[in-house]
Amino acid sequence: MKILVSACLLGENCKYSGGNNYNQAVCDFARGHQVVPVCPEVLGGLPTPRCPAEIVQGVVTNKEGINVDQEFRAGAAKALAIAKENGVELAILQSRSPSCGVKEIYDGTFSGTKIPGQGVFAKMLMDEGVRVLDAGELPKIILKNEDGKC
């Protein structure tokens, strides 16, 4: 199976802080599959490191109040094209990201408060019918499958 994965989850230093969100469970799950790593934010031309951003009233804005929506949406569109070109069947994305958040994102106040919602790229994938998983929920999903309760 072809699996698209947020590049930061695989250890690529593309996170806004300059680091990564390496996730062993994601790497273990992806082993034996064709992995397509992407970082929509980098694809959109944003530097690493960069100012943190959140979705504020539907627009991606960084902590300094600068509108970075165009960069986020352009990067998401490029990442979506990569997913389509590769025939991706599943995406595993970084939790709470304004690009990749699957079930919840930060509320736009830069206070750490989470709300239900999707990041720009996650929503694009879902709208295209790609199955999307939140990396933070992957261990629970694996356990359910092992217990035969899925």
Whereabouts are the PLM-identified features?
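Extreme N-terminal starter segment of soluble prokaryotic enzymes
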Residues: M1-L4
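Short, well-ordered beta-to-alpha junction loops that form the rim of enzyme active sites
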Residues: C8, Q94-S97, E137
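Short N-terminal binding/cap micro-motifs at the start of the first secondary-structure element
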Residues: G11-G18
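Short, surface-exposed acidic-centric catalytic microdomains
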Residues: N21-N62
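Short amphipathic alpha-helices and their capping/turn segments at secondary-structure boundaries
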Residues: Y22-V35, G75-L90
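Divalent-metal-activated hydrolytic enzyme cores
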Residues: L43, P52-I55, V59-K78, I82, ...
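Short, active-site-adjacent cap segments at secondary-structure transitions
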Residues: G45-L46, P98-G101, K140
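N-terminal glycine-rich phosphate/adenylate-binding segment common to multiple enzyme folds
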Residues: K78-T109
